């Protein structure tokens, strides 16, 4: 396990029209990578592409709804062909689902699982044989602190991110003795538009948020480094505390919600 130098690499990144994806794409381009951008919002994606092309002129973009899993898999191969190959796949696209459990529908859960978990799986399985054939590749999965901690009013979102964390961990074991590497990014509260999506309840969390550039720097470090899991910012102590005494964690979070603190 050794990482890949970003300069000169080709990186395909989903959810690239805003937030963590856009910040990561811009930074990767500035560091010398050719980037392939995937997103739903063509206008925003084109603006990010313009920024990337000023540093990496061969960068490309594809507009795609990753809720369509067949389209996601096809797109991964189309992007591979257009870029020549893909050294690094960054599965970053995600949607929120902010609902107290009594308001959650099966449709909410299916939508969160499809975009946040099944689409990264579809794209990974599409490119993995080609990465194997080339003998090089890194899959970077952007999960969430909510992929290690249960969060109030975010059961569907947490389920999708726990799934992505578990998948990444098991995949890293399966690929451990191969040249294909896996990285898992666990962002904490980051200042992106995921907090204010139309149709979502207001998130319970109302504390400080880090800029997406904090995660972008971490993504670059993860690609070039050799560690599997990266908490950005480093809130792993909360996860360790939960693991040490989960009953206290559950009671403590519930008490904070009930008192509004």
Give residue spans per PLM region.
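Active-site helix of classical SDR
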Residues: 124, 160
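Residue(s) in the substrate-gating loop at a strand-loop-helix junction
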Residues: 144
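The beta1-alpha1 cofactor-binding region of Rossmann-like NAD(H)/NADP(H)-dependent oxidoreductases
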Residues: 63-74, 106
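Conserved glycine-rich cofactor-binding loop
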Residues: 17-18
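SDR active-site lid
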Residues: 172-234
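Substrate-binding pocket helix/loop in short-chain dehydrogenase/reductase
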Residues: 100-101, 105-110
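Conserved glycine-rich Rossmann-like NAD(P)H-binding loop of the short-chain dehydrogenase/reductase
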Residues: 31-48
